[in-house]
Amino acid sequence: MSLIEKGRKKSPWIYHLNTGSCNGCDIEIMALLGPKYDAERFGVKLAASPKHADIVLITGPVTTQCRERMINVLSQVPEPRVIVSVGSCPASGNVFKDSYCVDGPLEKWTKVDVSVVGCSPKPEAILKGILEAVEILNNCRGQENNV
């Protein structure tokens, strides 16, 4: 394993994508990146562009307005990538389920690797989901290197 591969293993880049949420989960994600929970101690960094992301956190029900944007953003994330569904909305629509503008669940449009449920989930639960995603990502990278 090269020095760069070792570094990448310990510093996953996360891209956050809101697909129409109430912002409850988004607030918890921002709290997670702040000094109280300090996700950076695990090497987690927030990516400004999906092109630099290893892990994508998706919040909110997939709305008809956000669907094409989400597909476009996900197409820019390099493989291997891990998709983390945050909150109950991406999985079920939650309170937005029967809305005329919801075109979910998220799994209808992309494979979800980790699901963090709750409305809204606590930062600790989101961090646990991210660490699970890091493990999945490292396993994928390990398989790539063995090919």
Question: What does each model-found stretch correspond to?
Answer:
Residues 1-147:
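Iron-sulfur-associated redox domains of electron-transfer enzymes in respiratory
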